[in-house]
Amino acid sequence: MTDEADADLQPFAAPPATGAPAADKPARKPRRAAPRTSEFRIAEQPAFVLHSYPYRETSLVIDVLTRDHGRIALVAKGAKRPHSALRGVLQTFQPLSLSWSGKSELRTLTGAEWVGGMLPLAGDALLCGFYANELLVKFCAREDPHPPLFQHYLVTLTRLAHGEPPVQVLRSFERVLLRETGYAMTLKRTVARRAVEPDKLYVFDPQRGVRDAGSDAPSHWPVIAGQTLLDMEEDDYHRAQTVAQSKTLMRFLLNTYLGGTPLATRQILIDLQNL
């Protein structure tokens, strides 16, 4: 990324990640059992608004992704009033500093400040941002913090805002999302522990990982070139084949892990840009 893009990342410098190595099986990692509902007051937490909806006559419920507390729901009292200071602050795709109080699953927003330093999304980049938000809502459980995922979401928005190719940005985000929510599998070796070879063909078992292509594989498993898998492992999408096959693979995996639940924004992207 450019120096300008790097500057955009400074407001929310994430703490060092201490995640475990990626596992070969997609069995989800146990949810953190920390009793987050016992926390009464949190001040100035880095956050992004993922979604909001009306609550009673003058308020909103905002679904937010926070760096250290995961995804939580907050009541923004009076946010729908015409002259509320919150109306211009609680915007999607903008870095915020939020404070809240309460012990229930629905906390009360007590403060919100716009941090700034990020360009707004527009056009295709805006649609991609909504797609990323929908994935976060679908895959991230309440109060299950993933600081590395929070930081990569920030990077994703920055890359989109600076006009980087959406296909590459989304594939990178999808892989980090699956890794952080417990579905990580290596792409550079097979389930038999053999190194993936660039000139061979493979299938992807959603429960175990990369397998040699063969007649015993279900027909709906995507057939992927070894070169594509190796490129994806290195986050390299300059080959046209890698772009096309990685899209097929990630669409298959996301659909499988979501139990076939459709993504509204994914269909919009398919219809408009085939992303």
From Swiss-Prot:
One GO term describing the cellular component:
bacterial nucleoid
Look up keyword DNA repair and say if it applies: yes
The record's section on Gene3D superfamilies has: Nucleic acid-binding proteins, Recombination protein O, C-terminal domain
Which Pfam families does the record match to this protein? RecO_C, RecO_N
Compositionally biased residues, Low complexity: 11-24
Listed InterPro entries: ARFGAP/RecO, DNA_rep/recomb_RecO_N, NA-bd_OB-fold, RecO, RecO_C
Question: Where is coiled-coil annotated?
Answer: none
The answer to whether the entry has keyword DNA damage is: yes
Q: Keyword annotations for this protein?
A: DNA damage, DNA recombination, DNA repair
Q: Where is this region: Disordered?
A: 1-38
A GO BP entry is: DNA recombination
* Family classification: Belongs to the RecO family.
* Summary of the function given for this chain in its UniProt record: Involved in DNA repair and RecF pathway recombination.
Protein name per Swiss-Prot or TrEMBL = DNA repair protein RecO
